């Protein structure tokens, strides 16, 4: 009986020792990889900011209010037409499904 408990205790301590040693090493790797990740992230955000400002400047140079108004008008007319025809289609479909009642 005593040998079994001693064997179990040794195995538990061995597993705990491996866990402690295993947990210690990845933290160092994690610290270096997180700093690398942070550097990459900062670099990406820097490039993103430059690209965003360039595109925004280009958009402001080429912005045409008359074209914008025409696009909005076409969108409003087309959505009104689509909603009208969708209503007609729905009514026809319901009348076909119900039949002559």
Curated annotation (Swiss-Prot):
Residues 1-22 form the signal peptide. The keyword Transport applies. GO terms for molecular function: phospholipase activator activity; phospholipase binding. The keyword Secreted applies. It is found in: Secreted. Residues 66-74 are annotated as: Lipid binding. Its main location: secreted. Keywords: Chylomicron, Glycoprotein, HDL, LDL, Lipid degradation, Lipid metabolism, Lipid transport, Secreted, Sialic acid, Signal, Transport, VLDL. Proapolipoprotein C-II is synthesized as a sialic acid containing glycoprotein which is subsequently desialylated prior to its proteolytic processing. InterPro entries: Apo-CII (IPR008019), ApoC-II_dom_sf (IPR023121). One of its GO terms (cellular component) is chylomicron. GO terms for biological process: lipid catabolic process; lipid transport; positive regulation of phospholipid catabolic process. Pfam families: Apo-CII. Residues 78-101 are annotated as: Lipoprotein lipase cofactor. Residues 23-28 form a propeptide. Belongs to the apolipoprotein C2 family. Component of chylomicrons, very low-density lipoproteins (VLDL), low-density lipoproteins (LDL), and high-density lipoproteins (HDL) in plasma. Plays an important role in lipoprotein metabolism as an activator of lipoprotein lipase. Both proapolipoprotein C-II and apolipoprotein C-II can activate lipoprotein lipase. This is Apolipoprotein C-II. It comes from Neomonachus schauinslandi (Hawaiian monk seal). The gene is APOC2.
């Amino acid at each position: 009986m005593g040998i079994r408990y001693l064997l179990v205790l040794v195995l538990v301590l061995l597993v705990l020792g491996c866990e402690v040693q295993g947990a210690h090493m990845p933290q160092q790797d994690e610290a270096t990889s997180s700093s690398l990740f942070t550097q990459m992230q900062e670099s990406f955000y820097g490039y993103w900011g430059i690209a965003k400002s360039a595109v925004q400047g280009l958009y402001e140079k080429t912005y045409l209010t008359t074209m914008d108004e025409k696009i909005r008008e076409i969108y409003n007319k087309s959505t009104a037409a689509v909603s009208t025809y969708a209503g007609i289609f729905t009514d026809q479909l319901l009348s076909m499904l119900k039949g002559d009642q």
